Amino acid sequence: MNCRAAERKDDTVENEQMLEQKKLDEFLQVINENLKELREKKKEVDQENKELYDAYMEGDVELYSSLMVSSTMQDHVNHSITANESALEKTHFGRIDYLDQEKGEQYRLYIGKHGITKNATDIVIMDWRAAAASIYYEGTTGECSYRTPQGKMIPIRLDLKRTFDIDGPVLKGFYDSDTAANDELLIKYLAKNKDVVLGEIVATIQQEQNTIIRERPNRSMIIQGVAGSGKTTVAVHRISYILYNFSDRYDPSEICIIGSNDILLNYIASGLPSLDVYNTKQYRMEKLFEYLIGAYLPKKYEIIPTLVQESSELRLKSSLAFVQTIERWTRDEESRIIPTEEVRDKSYTFLSQESIDQYCRYFDDRSVVSKMENLNTRLAAAIKLEMDGEDANVRKEMLKKYKKHFSKNYKKRSLVQLYLDFLFSLEEHLANTTENANATEDANENSTNTNIMSSTTWSEWKKRVKKGFFDCYDLAAMALLAHGWLDEGDDDEFAQMYIDEAQDYGVAVYYVIKKRMPKTAFMIMGDVSQNINYDSGMNDWEELRQIMLPDSKDPSNEGLRGRFYTLCKSYRNTIEISNFAAQILDRSSFKTYPIEPIVRHGSPVGIWKENDETAMTMRVQALIEQLKKEDYKTIALICRDEDEAARLKSLTNCVSDTGNEAVDCTTDSVTDGAIADTSADIIAGITVTVLPLALTKGLEFDAVILYNPNEECYADSDRDAKLLYVAVTRALHELHIVYTGELCKLLSDCPTQP
């Protein structure tokens, strides 16, 4: 009986396989028909667009609107072709059968990376971003529900959730279950190289990731995610989800992505078009502040890295106390500059003290200059009203007398001079403070002992500013000063902002961003265990939560309440690499978050001790050749800093090409992310890349070789524990460590190759 039951089950599976293969064939036929029609449409639209453009350029300006409509149609057709071509490679990845309990109707939906329609109206494959598709990611068989973009909950009974393994026109298999099938497919994908994994992420989005992706669009969030937990993946898919479901509320140009370096930003941007996301804005953090300050910056200036500053200076100007002190100084200066006494002349009272105070309180968020100008305007209006019956010349003289009443004490200063004046004031205040430690009376414990700076450090800081050399924190401070002194209002250009590797910046920058963009919804992602800027970055999230997330206790603010999420599952590394990384964190004293690696085994971590630099170079070359033979497409050589990366590149000779890729056998085949622009090479995944550790943030590689982490390079400290944790968690499949001398203590006890 058991044998017969097994036979019947096998027959059922085989029949289902045939039926699903037939459905796949039908989908492919629809897609090919779509492509045929779209390519014909493209010829027509391209020709029309060319004719309109030529006529417009010849002077027919009335055709401008028609040209814009035609260009929009051209973009739409091109995007549709791209989506259908992508669907040819993998039409769909999931299927759900469910009963809508409100309508009493049964549905069977196939879900893919791109929505595919037949005859332009009939949906044959549902886009993964559609509301009902969330059932696939979160629903379990039986009674459940899904939320529409408008917030309505739809009760359903889920009868089947099926996951497909498809390769072009071939259905290789399918799995029916709740989460096991999704996990099984995920593990299978993770075993592939990096390029393959990136192309198949939508098929393996996990429940906790899906919850974040489909959060309300106006909700701000902080995401603490361990290395490899998919923080960046969640962000780009959330952008795609929002633009798909709320296209009437959000334009791509209103979405801004912030990253710590151009390599990371290019890596993120490269994945957006495949998710139907175009024309978003991307900035490094310092470039964002440069953009916000705009014309208030001097004609000649240079943005410098924070690494050139003293640690005491960095600790001060990256702190919350520092930017809050800027605001207090601005208010104190405003009180000194703007007269608040009643404006009275002879028998006329133009403005009472109460009305002036009331105005300043009501428009507290306006800049000093804006308040002065508006008060002068109000005073002029009051004079005209009160002296309406007076002789015109008398009234004119009175207006002239009080024309600059509220700005008479104001000395016009450049933004740089305002910043210098503040720094002089702060230095004097700290020098006169008994403990010479706190920038403010209510400075918290974390800022204690961070503000003690020598006179030399103060002098060097002010000299740099005066010469026009600004780091990210100088720019943040000046952005806050511009907002408090010069700007006309808040910045409302960006409705959504996504900040990756957030822990690398101090809370000061977030305080300024929030002040300048109070209406923006933020998604802030990071891992405090990966803070590579120990003196200035964040080692916990508490201050940031207070700044960026609205009060969660206010029930009337449900739609805007901020959320803090933790992602503990690591999908990037093998068990062996994850355990190795966890041992590094175990030796540290800072707060860490638990890592839950997906069960995927690989090779043990390789530890290679060599006698000298020449032997290390030979070992690196041998490892590169070995890794290429294993068909790894992305291999990173990670060094402590840029100098070591440049030196390693000069020493490393190209190994012979053993794959199908055409690589010139010169040292140029080993690229240098510190000196040359190699972001395209990294994204394409066809080269061995030499990188300083700081530039690896947010990236991942099939294999990593960590170069010379000996006791001379890395101390047994929390600072270096975070650096090494970042380095080793870049590897998807293999990690090798090559060194001379004594291996640093942070790595010496980690589980390695026997």
For the regions a protein language model found, what residue spans apply to each?
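Conserved helicase motor core of SF1/SF2 NTP-dependent helicases
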Residues: S253, D262, N266-Y278, Y283-E290, ...
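Acidic, Ala/Val/Gly-enriched low-complexity intrinsically disordered segments
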Residues: A5, A437-A443, A662-V663, V670, ...
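Alpha-helical nucleic-acid-binding subdomain
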Residues: L243-Y498, Q503-V512, T520-A521, N539, ...
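Short glycine/proline-rich turn/loop motifs
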Residues: D183-L190, E460-W461, R561-R563
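P-loop NTPase Walker
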Residues: N2-N34, L38, K188-I303, T696-K697, ...
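A structural signal for short, well-ordered beta-strand segments and their strand-loop junctions
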Residues: R95-D97, T163, I222, V234, ...
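Extended, charged low-complexity regulatory segments
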Residues: M1-V202, Q206, N210-R214, A439, ...
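Short, hydrophobic/proline-enriched secondary-structure or compact coil segments at domain edges
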Residues: H92-Y98, Y473-A482, I638
